[in-house]
């Protein structure tokens, strides 16, 4: 009873739901190393509820002898997604491509086919042109006051286990307009208003 932890069990479900509501895709591609880290169960649940398909490939970097071999395999999967699987969106999952520059290079495969790429985590991917959009499920601006209120309650005598643990973050949306323009995507006025950050070269 002396422990407390912040939880947000539906963060990635809400994220995928937002992406689906925005793009209305029928098949979204996903390459992942670890199902739990990449929130595959959460995403799959949303897919089943909404009737779209996740075209998933499991690929562990540690299984490859060198980086070049890994990225060559990754590139071949991406090309297969576009040419054979018929994906109409792609989600860039956690830790699949640590380098933003490399991610931007490989995501051109999707952009050349006018397929939007969204990110699971890391607004740097949006800033670097690797992803068009991210709805960050972790809102530090909102979570901070929530946690500080909990700490204050504990200092004032409350028992940690009796305090609220779940905080549902507001979506933190970052959009790259240059990428959107490249693939011919026109964001709505409502989306632009909802953005916390808009990346644009002009």
What do these predicted regions represent?
Residues 29-32, 81-99, 118-120:
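Periplasmic-binding protein-like
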Residues 47-71:
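Short beta-strand elements in bilobed, periplasmic/extracellular small-molecule ligand-binding domains
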Residues 34-37, 61-62, 95-99, 123-127, ...:
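Solvent-exposed loop/turn segments at secondary-structure junctions
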Residues 1, 106-130:
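Venus flytrap/periplasmic-binding-protein-like
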Residues 153-202:
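Hinge/cleft segment of the Venus flytrap/periplasmic-binding protein
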Residues 2, 25-27, 50-55, 85-90, ...:
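Loop/turn elements at helix/coil->beta-strand transitions in domains of secreted/extracellular proteins
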Residues 4-54, 165-179:
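An alpha-beta-alpha
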Residues 1-18, 129-145:
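Short beta-strand elements at the ligand-binding edges of bilobed clamshell
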């Amino acid at each position: 009873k002396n422990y407390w932890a912040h939880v947000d069990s539906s963060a990635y479900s809400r994220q995928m739901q937002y992406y689906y509501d925005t793009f209305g895709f029928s098949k979204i591609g996903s390459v992942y190393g670890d199902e739990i880290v990449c929130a595959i169960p959460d995403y799959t649940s949303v897919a089943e509820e909404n009737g779209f398909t996740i075209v998933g490939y499991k690929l562990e970097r540690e299984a490859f002898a060198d980086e070049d071999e890994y990225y060559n395999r990754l590139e071949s999967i991406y090309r297969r997604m576009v040419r054979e699987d018929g994906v109409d969106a792609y989600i860039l999952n956690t830790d699949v491509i640590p380098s933003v520059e490399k991610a931007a290079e490989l995501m051109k495969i999707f952009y050349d086919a006018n397929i939007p790429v969204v990110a699971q985590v890391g607004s740097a991917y949006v800033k670097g042109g690797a992803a068009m959009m991210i709805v960050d499920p972790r809102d530090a601006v909102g979570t901070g006051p929530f946690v500080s209120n909990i700490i204050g309650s504990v200092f004032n005598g409350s028992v940690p286990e009796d305090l609220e643990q779940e905080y549902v973050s507001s979506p933190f949306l970052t959009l790259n307009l240059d990428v959107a323009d490249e693939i011919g995507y026109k964001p709505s006025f409502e989306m632009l208003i909802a953005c916390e950050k808009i990346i644009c070269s002009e």
